[in-house]
């Protein structure tokens, strides 16, 4: 067995032992030893391999798999720009705390600075965006007469791989996130003709080489619930049963609220204190409340970092130790304004003469059912789901909220669907046309690759960036400029794009969406709904006026 083959087999075996169920592989020459080892593990049923040609989409496919499966996922690639293309996915994984392992093959380090082809200083390329940069080191030449060398190397390689998994899952830090595992590989890069497919042994019974129990991170925080309190539950919020009775503005990716409070209802209330769960990312009324220096904010998170954009948090912890009882009058008032806000949104939607992205979001929100998984685009769709009063009881909701980019959303949805397929449930993804077009190469799934069994991508197509209609850039004063440089109309034929990737698709009206989503189907499909963005500003103004 040559050194690179031995090294790759040990790494793959130890990754499986550490809980890796899925690996995304991008083709290349330098990572050939890893590719052979991964293919062997896939054939043996030890992991599921997904081959992709674009590292950018591969990274987000891995994020979708990791988030939905709650397990570390590797993405393996060759040296050079292949590694650099993982940048956006690594940044998202950092801030969303996703256990993404970048398995980057490299040339021998002595070639750095020599002008060797496809070579750059890739170890450490991601800087402080990763939890760790770990190098396996170049495998030495192996001698058949020195079996002790292989025994020592096997232990070193397995130990290093365990460090990678522990850093990615946060087993010792309570802070999961991306890790770069850089492996310089010497030639030959393919198994020898007489190779018997063996692998140096790991621990008995399939255990990892170094067992690391998950760390417990517990910081109780005393909070008196007597003052009028609202809970703001953002991305990554934990479950807090002792806060369930409090009015809660919950983002779609947060645990569903038992006592929901519409985000637009905050303008009608004067809370005396706020309990912030996770990291709020969506609503301006929420940001304004958290920035109010007269309102104490208590931050509860599931890890060592806590958000505090305005510097207004008075205390942090991981769980609340509560005292006092909420005023029943306050709870009644919050319920009244929530019901009023939800009704106002729905009434204005019904009265609006044109179909907008908000209408599409309402139709999707009404169509999902317990057991579903819903993936929301990071621009308007995730906000629209909250505005239409969506409370996802029994529904797993995903959205890339780490740094909230639109890139990689198609791939994230496919990865999440592939993981959710194991439950037998369906996955629905809602995204805008820019988000869809931006990651359209994510639709490319080769004929030999695992394909989602039940994924519907709903594209709300308003031919551009509808979110800018609602921001300052969409002010009518700038109409002569904003339509082009912010709206960015593209005139892409979504149906033709889908056909190029052999993806089933059709265009429907918003009123047909509920029935279409309820149709039995197999595989992946796209439902396109044409929408208007020119009237979004007026629609939102009418909702605010109704409140």
Swiss-Prot record:
Main EC class the enzyme belongs to: transferase
InterPro entries: MenaQ_synth_MenD, THDP-binding, Thiamin_PyroP_enz_TPP-bd_dom
Cofactor binding note from Swiss-Prot or TrEMBL: Binds 1 thiamine pyrophosphate per subunit.
Biological processes annotated in GO: menaquinone biosynthetic process
EC number of the protein: 2.2.1.9
Reactions catalysed: isochorismate + 2-oxoglutarate + H(+) = 5-enolpyruvoyl-6-hydroxy-2-succinyl-cyclohex-3-ene-1-carboxylate + CO2
Pathway this chain belongs to: Quinol/quinone metabolism; 1,4-dihydroxy-2-naphthoate biosynthesis; 1,4-dihydroxy-2-naphthoate from chorismate: step 2/7; Quinol/quinone metabolism; menaquinone biosynthesis
GO molecular function: 2-succinyl-5-enolpyruvyl-6-hydroxy-3-cyclohexene-1-carboxylic-acid synthase activity; magnesium ion binding; manganese ion binding; thiamine pyrophosphate binding
Cofactor(s) demanded: Mg(2+); Mn(2+); thiamine diphosphate
Keywords recorded for this protein, A-Z: Magnesium, Manganese, Menaquinone biosynthesis, Metal-binding, Thiamine pyrophosphate, Transferase
Top-level lineage group: Bacteria
Pfam families: TPP_enzyme_N
NCBIfam families per UniProt: menD
Entry function: Catalyzes the thiamine diphosphate-dependent decarboxylation of 2-oxoglutarate and the subsequent addition of the resulting succinic semialdehyde-thiamine pyrophosphate anion to isochorismate to yield 2-succinyl-5-enolpyruvyl-6-hydroxy-3-cyclohexene-1-carboxylate (SEPHCHC).
Family designation: Belongs to the TPP enzyme family. MenD subfamily.
Subunit structure: Homodimer.
Protein's name according to its UniProt entry: 2-succinyl-5-enolpyruvyl-6-hydroxy-3-cyclohexene-1-carboxylate synthase
Source organism phylogeny: Bacteria, Bacillati, Actinomycetota, Actinomycetes, Mycobacteriales
